[in-house]
Amino acid sequence: MNRGSYASVSERQPAPPESTAAAGEFYDEMWERYGHLDAASPAAFHRRRLIVELCQRHAGGARHVLDAGCGRGELLQELRRALPGAELSASDVSLASVRETARLNPALRVFQMDLSRPDFDRVHAADLGRFELITCSEVVEHIPNDRRAVERVAKLLAPRGLLVLTVPGGKMSRFDELIGHQRHYSSGALLELALGAELDPLEVLAWGFPFQNLYRSAVRVASRFSMPSPSEPKSRGSSRNISDLLGASYAVFGRALKPLFYLNRNFWGEQMLLVARKR
């Protein structure tokens, strides 16, 4: 397996705010503007499918499960169906996401969690060592100190607990920069994150060849011409227009591409997935 550089793409995007309140507000706004794109994206659909398959294969008997970085709860819904005997919890730094997920899942525990806050261990002391399975999908690429973030997720795992982590690979698009990506990853970088958190990797997948890669290349080209760079001023109106345009494109092309994504392979792809066990 290729052990590439730690951050395989240069870190061009300014860091999102460090404080929990400011970071939460940033991602509240991102979900408001662009959250609907996730529902139409074939990449997001198949990413959730792969996560569920990995959870069932490696941790089907887990009793306590956390979806760390739950967004609006799409993955959580699929985990509920796939792991009917588990006690599920969910967390996110975005308070709007926490409230929406709690509204849709009133029987579940849903709470705000900021993996960057200095007093993380004190705030989440009751959950340290609690979960046999944690999913953390498309989260740590947003966090300036991703090593520390993964170490903190690992602290929440029970002994021999399992982490299923996903991050993007390949080059960043302008859209990635706008929504706060700090970096993208290689297989080697993902392995380093796991080992640095004292997790033993069980599987590392670079899924998506060829159709995910082609799809991501198209997104990079489209966003270069349709979106402002992160350094340019942007109005809410222009962002909403861009979001609507992308949403319409996703709805049309996503429906056509979704079946093709079943043919993607677990190598040379730009969707990185890690399964790792706590020592």
How should each PLM-predicted stretch be described?
Residues 218-226:
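Short, electropositive alpha-helical surface patch
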Residues 199-210:
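Conserved S-adenosyl-L-methionine
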Residues 123, 175-179, 213-219:
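Short aromatic-enriched loop/helix-cap "lid" or pocket-rim segments at secondary-structure transitions
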Residues 137-140, 166:
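Residues lining the SAM
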Residues 161-167:
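Conserved beta-strand signature within the Rossmann-like core of class I S-adenosyl-L-methionine
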Residues 1-129, 133, 137, 147-150, ...:
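Conserved N-terminal segment of class I S-adenosyl-L-methionine
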Residues 148-159:
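A short glycine-rich, Lys/Arg-flanked "PGG" loop and its adjoining helix->strand segment in the class I
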Residues 38-43, 174-193, 209:
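Acceptor-substrate binding/catalytic loop of class I
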